[in-house]
Every structure is written in C-alpha cells, then in structure tokens.
Regions:
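Conserved short histidine dyad/triad with adjacent acidic residue
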Residues: 46-77, 107-111
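Short glycine/proline-enriched turns and hinge-like loops at secondary-structure junctions
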Residues: 59, 77-79, 96-98, 116-118
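Ligand-binding loop in jelly-roll beta-barrel domains
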Residues: 108-137
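Short intrinsically disordered coil segments
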Residues: 67, 80-82, 138-145
Length: 164
C-alpha cells in the first residue's frame, strides 16, 4: 500500500544559494554541498553563517554558524526549542559551556547571551522558529528584521496547530 503524501509535502523549504535544487520534484531529497555555499556575514561582529535549510512559512531553520574568538550573540529569546551541536571550539553562556562534540538544547522561552570561547566556534543550529533578539527597545531576528513581521505568522501557525 502506498503512503499518502503528508500535508507538509507542500512546505516552502529552500536552501538559499543552492541553485541545483531549482528543478527538483517537490518530494525529492535535497543534498547540500555545504562547502560550496558562501559564508554570509551577520550583523553581529565575528559571526558568519551558512543557511542549510529555511522554511519561512513554518519557521524551520538550520544553519551552520562560525564564530570568531569571543564573538557574541547579544540578549535573545528562544521562541521555540533551539538545538545546537558544536563541531569545533566552544559556545558559552551564563549557564555553562558546550565544547566540540557536545550538544545543547534550550527550551522555548529561555533568554540569554552567548559567546564563542578563545578558539572561536563552529556549530550547527536547528530552530523551530528563529530567535528573537532584543536591541534598543526593538524585537528583531538574526538579520535585524522586525521579528513580528519576519516570523510572527509562522509562529501563529505553529501555535494554532499545537492547540487545534
């Protein structure tokens, strides 16, 4: 018996900068040549990223993040669960340190600052919805865009589905 397609088969997930995905069928696997993707500077000094997959309709985001020694992610909230696997170096916050080969996850609603250790860091971050950063009385995403405008609708869909 063939399985029926999931209602999620129409997700709008993409890997930016991966032109080889343009003509794939909707349910085909997307193989990402990570080394061919460019590092993109973030608005935070010493932090660069590669977006591996993002779905603006659901908020799903997986990224590779490279942090220079001491580079800092300022005050931010994990709107939903965030997961981080450290590949090299370390990621530190007021609660502890996550070193190479270690994994940390943070529950929805947790809020903190984080910074790279003396060797810097390379990590994979997996987000159900991107973090909300608090800057100058504004709530923005990692790119500095108004969080509500960028991700509010995806968050509302998630909450509606959760309580439906």
């Amino acid at each position: 018996m063939a399985l029926k397609p999931s209602p999620r088969a129409d997700m709008s997930a993409i890997t930016p900068k991966a032109s080889s995905h343009a003509n794939l069928p909707p349910l085909a696997s997307r193989f990402v040549e990570v080394n061919s993707l460019p590092w993109e500077k973030s608005k935070y000094p010493g932090i660069e990223t590669k977006t591996l997959v993002v779905d603006r309709s659901t908020g799903v985001l997986t990224m590779l993040m490279k942090m220079a020694p001491g580079a800092k992610l300022p005050d931010h909230e994990h709107v939903l669960i965030e997961q981080t696997f450290v590949l090299q170096g370390s990621l530190i916050c007021g609660e502890g340190e996550c070193g190479a080969g270690d994994f940390v996850w943070r529950p929805a609603g947790s809020r903190h600052e984080a910074w790279a250790g003396p060797e810097g860091g390379l990590m994979i971050g997996i987000f159900q919805i991107p973090n909300r950063f608090y800057e100058d009385g504004r709530e923005v995403d990692f790119l500095g865009k108004d969080w509500e405008e960028a991700w509010g609708a995806a968050y509302e869909r998630h909450e509606h589905a959760r309580f439906a």
